[in-house]
């Protein structure tokens, strides 16, 4: 019996070598597909759920960085990744990220990328990113944000009856009684979410008063009462700031940030109790950072670095700037999405990162600040083949209330049309004369509008795992086929050997040897590899 086992092992040895080699190849290939960004922090989607929350990818456009940041978009970071879907996964693990912009390597296909940029395209719930045509880039947006953008483009150049100042805005306010909101003519306000004790009163056709607001968030739906726009609605969020939130939005020192852009902004000075202008660099700012002075005043009216009298007459004491308690690291082991994780696992508020003052025990919050600067600089250096990006902007009446006749360009009809300009803010798709409008935007059509062309599929985690499973099954089938071939070949040799040279063993011994050999082959081909 022992010699038979030895012979069986000897016969199987040649088959074992290619089997092991193939198994190692399959295993290494499988391991290579598992690399990727770290798992998402608490509250953020990961894996297949993450990838499924993004669009397939809009090709042929690049972010107009200066215009987007000027509108309120936020550059988050530029991680080093190898593939497009890794960039999307990095967006999933980054708080407030809703755009993953991928720069492709020339002539290397869709999965070889040169750079990855993560952006927050929302400001006050509005989509504020702007794009310009440029080959070699793919944009992945969260489906929710992309859907809002497409709805905006679908409404397109017909306009909306919702006053511009209130379309999708997110108000930050101090506790006050009542909150008076002006320029709301022809709108009905209905509470969708929040404390139901709040009352909406209209004592003037042009303004509403909100009574009973407490700390927390309220969602109102505005509906146009004008017959010209019977179905127009918009949501407005009102957040009554708590003491802790007021520290962030009103008492934090103005923070230029590490990036070297130049964007005019407003911040609140609690010492003088006024809003002041400053120049924002483009990244790593804090919440005391407003696009318009009106927002700043509404959020921080009456806040000072000492006693503050609330609507109920109680005294609320605010420190000069964020409390020292919030500057101390918390080493509980779990960081919130709004916190920065130090290298030693401790947590600090995210606005303390790269503020030129080490707040982590190991100073890791000041160790990698150049990555933001280099990523933002690279994004700003991208050139556009055309300077006609304003020609695809929707006509913007602005925030003022004048009635100035102007012309705007419609890329779908490739003609210019009239609209009424309010006199301030707005955009550059705004011309005094029709001929000036046509000459400025000649050649621009719907193909230049972001998001209305074909999309490129993005591999999901599920599809990658399926590909890995198929690859593994193929490897196993090949191994089994090789082993089977070698086994039957050796069996055939045994048959011819027995026919010409009968072995000097009893028949029972021959049967036992054959069963033993089959037993060994079965174990070798079916045991876990």
Swiss-Prot record:
Residues the UniProt record annotates as site (Reactive bond): 260-261, 401-402
Cellular location(s): Secreted; Cytoplasm; Cell membrane
UniProt KW ATP-binding keyword: no
Keyword terms of this UniProt record: Cell membrane, Cytoplasm, Disulfide bond, Glycoprotein, Membrane, Protease inhibitor, Repeat, Secreted, Serine protease inhibitor, Signal
Gene Ontology terms, MF aspect: serine-type endopeptidase inhibitor activity
One of the Pfam families matching this protein, by short name: MANEC
BPTI/Kunitz inhibitor domain boundaries: 250-300, 391-441
Domain LDL-receptor class A: 334-370
InterPro entries: Ig-like_fold, Kunitz_BPTI, Kunitz_BPTI_sf, LDL_receptor-like_sf, LDLR_class-A_CS, LDrepeatLR_classA_rpt, MANSC_dom, MANSC_N
Entry annotated with the keyword Disulfide bond: yes
Disulphide bridges: 250-300, 259-283, 275-296, 335-347, 342-360, 354-369, 391-441, 400-424, 416-437
Alphabetized PROSITE patterns for the sequence: BPTI_KUNITZ_1, BPTI_KUNITZ_2, LDLRA_1, LDLRA_2, MANSC
Domain MANSC: 57-140
Segment forming the signal sequence: 1-35
Main location: secreted
GO CC, any one term: plasma membrane
Example GO biological process: neural tube closure
Glycan-linked positions: 66, 235, 523
Alphabetized PANTHER family for the sequence: KUNITZ-TYPE PROTEASE INHIBITOR 1 (PTHR46750:SF1)
Its job: Inhibitor of HGFAC. Inhibits serine protease activity of ST14/matriptase in vitro. Inhibits serine protease activity of TMPRSS13, via the BPTI/Kunitz inhibitor 1 domain.
Domain comment in the entry: This inhibitor contains two inhibitory domains.
Subunit structure: Interacts with HGFAC. Interacts with TMPRSS13; the interaction promotes the phosphorylation and cell membrane localization of TMPRSS13.
Protein name (Swiss-Prot/TrEMBL): Kunitz-type protease inhibitor 1
Protein species of origin: Homo sapiens
């Amino acid at each position: 019996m022992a010699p038979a086992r030895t012979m069986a092992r000897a016969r199987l040895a040649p088959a074992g070598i290619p089997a092991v080699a193939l198994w190692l190849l399959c295993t290494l290939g499988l391991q290579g597909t598992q690399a990727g960004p770290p798992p998402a922090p608490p509250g953020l989607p990961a894996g297949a759920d993450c990838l499924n929350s993004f669009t397939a990818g809009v090709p042929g456009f690049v972010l107009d960085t200066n215009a987007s940041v000027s509108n309120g978009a936020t550059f988050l970071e530029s991680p080093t990744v190898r593939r497009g879907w890794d960039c999307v996964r990095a967006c999933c693990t980054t708080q407030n990220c809703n755009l993953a912009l991928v720069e492709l390597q020339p002539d290397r296909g869709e999965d070889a990328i040169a750079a990855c940029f993560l952006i927050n395209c929302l400001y006050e719930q509005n989509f504020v990113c702007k794009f310009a045509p440029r080959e070699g880039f793919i944009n992945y947006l969260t489906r929710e944000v992309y859907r809002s953008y497409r709805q905006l483009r679908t409404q397109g150049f017909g306009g909306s009856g919702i006053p511009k100042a209130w379309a999708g805005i997110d108000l930050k306010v101090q506790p006050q009684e009542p909150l008076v909101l002006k320029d709301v003519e022809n709108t009905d306000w209905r509470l969708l979410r929040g404390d139901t004790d709040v009352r909406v009163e209209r004592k003037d056709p042009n303004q509403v008063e909100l009574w009973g607001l407490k700390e927390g968030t309220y969602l109102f739906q505005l509906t146009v009462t004008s017959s010209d726009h019977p179905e127009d609605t918009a949501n407005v969020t009102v957040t009554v700031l708590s003491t802790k939130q007021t520290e962030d939005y009103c008492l934090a020192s103005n923070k230029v940030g590490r990036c070297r852009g130049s964007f005019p902004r407003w911040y609140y000075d609690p010492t003088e109790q006024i809003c002041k202008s400053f120049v924002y660099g483009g990244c790593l700012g804090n919440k005391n950072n407003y696009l318009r002075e009106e927002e700043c005043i509404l959020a921080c009216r009456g806040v000072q670095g000492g006693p503050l009298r609330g609507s109920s007459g109680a005294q609320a004491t605010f420190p000069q700037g964020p409390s020292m308690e919030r500057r101390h690291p918390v080493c509980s082991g779990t960081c919130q999405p709004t916190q920065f994780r130090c290298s030693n696992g401790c947590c600090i508020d995210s606005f303390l990162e790269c503020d030129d003052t080490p707040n982590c025990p190991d100073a890791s919050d000041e160790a990698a600040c150049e990555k933001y600067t280099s990523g933002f600089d690279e994004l700003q250096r991208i050139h556009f083949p055309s300077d006609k990006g304003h020609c695809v902007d929707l006509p913007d009446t602005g925030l003022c209330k004048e009635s100035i006749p102007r012309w705007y360009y419609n890329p779908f009809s490739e003609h210019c049309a009239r609209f009424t300009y309010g006199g301030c803010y707005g955009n550059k798709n705004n011309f005094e004369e029709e001929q000036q409008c046509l000459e400025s935007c000649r050649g621009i059509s719907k193909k230049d509008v972001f998001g209305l062309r074909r999309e490129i599929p993005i591999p999901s985690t599920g599809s990658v795992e399926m590909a890995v499973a198929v690859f593994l099954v193929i490897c196993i089938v090949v191994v089994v086929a090789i082993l089977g071939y070698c086994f039957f070949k050796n069996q055939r040799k045994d048959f011819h050997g027995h026919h010409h040279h009968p072995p000097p063993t009893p028949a029972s011994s021959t049967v036992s040897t054959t069963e033993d050999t089959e037993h060994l082959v079965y174990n070798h081909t079916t045991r876990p590899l």
